[in-house]
Amino acid sequence: MIDQFSAHPPDGFQVLRLPQATPGFEAEFDLLTTVDGSLKRRIESLPLYRHWSKWLRVRTAFIGTTVSEYALFPAAWSARSLVKRLRKALGWCYPMMIIKDIPQHSPLLDDSANRYAERLLEACKAEGFVLVEGQALAYVPIDFTSVEEYLGRLSSSRRKDIRRKWRKREDLTIREVPTGDAQFQLDALIDEYYRLYLNVYDQSEIHFDRLSREFFEQMLRDAGSGGMVFEYRHEDRLIGYNVCFVHDGKLIDKYIGLQYPEARSFNLYFISWLINLDYALSHGLTHYVAGWTDPEIKSYLGASFTFTCHAVYVRNALLRGLARRFSRYFESDRQWSDRREPANRSGS
């Protein structure tokens, strides 16, 4: 998928050619993208916001991609050498540079990868980067023998609600279609998949990477990627899908497309969650990795979470100091997690 990202980057992105083929891109970044919703609304309600809001959009160099869970780094480079090289190459020519999605003690990575990430964060701090908590990555360890056992770990009220929603499964036809299947040679089907993806993108609170139709076409026609598409149809009409990939013994849930309002009427989010868990279990996988968005509903469904860190280098020294002081306001998922912990301890 990295090659597909490079060949067909999201709208408004330009791929960067970096040392040792480290993936990266440049894009206009809205500084309010990850700000807590209530604060964002207050800022947007300020006088003349539409006139001065352009100053909140900054041309930024990103190290990483939007199609991988974690940043990808060349094994041949030490963390310190890589960070120095990147800062010298990009730090002077962009107002802002972000090394995105650096793992923090991730249960999804081995000890070697986690140690490298620790050294990378230390090197970033030494080079003047501001460290900002990233989004919450949802995952479920496949440490149960049946979906019923998994549901048994949830509260009785949640079990009852999920089982009630699951009854809609009887009205659906569900197919597992590997990427590269002959059906994806039909341009009309690619168009339909892309339209359903845009439905989800348009109703999302965060708008950053709008994938292109060309990217979807290459992804769905790639037989060698390990991709599996879960199609949901009602009376032969496509009302939703998940595009997942099997990688390193894990089922990675990457993209979802939904037809509204049918997807809500048939509880597709809940049904697809259990379908994906069952697939991971039946194929002997170790984890289901469920992505970055909608942490509240994924928590309700029983997910655990691991956080990443973004290392931000601001070219202007004064603004760099301000970024360090106000960085906590850009950590909306961490704020959500901190609010969630007391509730969990109280048993709610």
Model segments located where?
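N-acyltransferase acceptor-side catalytic subdomain
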Residues: 1-348
